[in-house]
Amino acid sequence: MSVTIVSKRYASALFDIVLASSAVDETEKELNEIKKVLKADQELNDFLVHPKITADKKKHLIAEAFKGVSTHVLHTMYLLIDRGRTNIFSEMTSEFVKLANRTKQIDDAIVYSVKPLSGAEIQSLSEVFAKKAGVTSLRVENVIDKDLIGGVKIRIGNRIYDGSVSGKLSRIERQLAGENR
């Protein structure tokens, strides 16, 4: 079974549990924090996937390292350890965030620009493109991309809105190339 399918199943099960107890936001924060730690600490990842280290030792380390997390998150980690699936934690977290966002009518957007955008510019883009995306609000991440020349390019899910100068030049180039055939 593919990692994506398995990740979605674990994320969905955890989401259903925390939705019933109204702890979606807290769980999302905890999962993202653990994801950051696992991404930053390769030794911890190696420990969790090492076949000669017992599940009990792995669980003990997780319990000590993440003392403040909720029992739902901790037990999900234990389940992943028992089933030898700690490698899907990052993708499971991403799937959980997608479920939480869908419930809250929020989507994530990446805004590429030549220079950092001000808070007002980000807010304005968020309001305009939230309507286009069919959600109430967008969480915007601003990424600097000097190749754009000017303007912005916005990615929301699998949709891209390209209002950059380089994008416009590319479209003009394709049109001219099409006319020369």
From Swiss-Prot:
One cellular component GO annotation, for this chain's record? proton-transporting ATP synthase complex
Q: How does it sit in the membrane?
A: Peripheral membrane protein
UniProt cross-references to InterPro entries, sorted A to Z: ATP_synth_OSCP/delta_N_sf, ATPase_OSCP/d_CS, ATPase_OSCP/dsu
Extract the Gene3D superfamilies matched here: N-terminal domain of the delta subunit of the F1F0-ATP synthase
The molecular function GO annotations come to: proton-transporting ATP synthase activity, rotational mechanism
Q: Where in the cell is it found?
A: Cell membrane
Tell me any Pfam family this protein matches.
Answer: OSCP
Instruction: List keywords of the entry alphabetically.
Output: ATP synthesis, Cell membrane, CF(1), Hydrogen ion transport, Ion transport, Membrane, Transport
Q: How does it assemble?
A: F-type ATPases have 2 components, F(1) - the catalytic core - and F(0) - the membrane proton channel. F(1) has five subunits: alpha(3), beta(3), gamma(1), delta(1), epsilon(1). F(0) has three main subunits: a(1), b(2) and c(10-14). The alpha and beta chains form an alternating ring which encloses part of the gamma chain. F(1) is attached to F(0) by a central stalk formed by the gamma and epsilon chains, while a peripheral stalk is formed by the delta and b chains.
Family of this protein: Belongs to the ATPase delta chain family.
Against PANTHER family, the record matches this protein to: ATP SYNTHASE DELTA CHAIN
* Function recorded in the entry: F(1)F(0) ATP synthase produces ATP from ADP in the presence of a proton or sodium gradient. F-type ATPases consist of two structural domains, F(1) containing the extramembraneous catalytic core and F(0) containing the membrane proton channel, linked together by a central stalk and a peripheral stalk. During catalysis, ATP synthesis in the catalytic domain of F(1) is coupled via a rotary mechanism of the central stalk subunits to proton translocation. This protein is part of the stalk that links CF(0) to CF(1). It either transmits conformational changes from CF(0) to CF(1) or is implicated in proton conduction.
* NCBIfam families the UniProt entry points to: ATP_synt_delta, PRK05758.2-4
- From the Swiss-Prot or TrEMBL record, give the protein name: ATP synthase subunit delta
The protein's organism comes out as Bacillus pumilus (strain SAFR-032)
The opening ranks of the lineage are: Bacteria, Bacillati, Bacillota, Bacilli, Bacillales
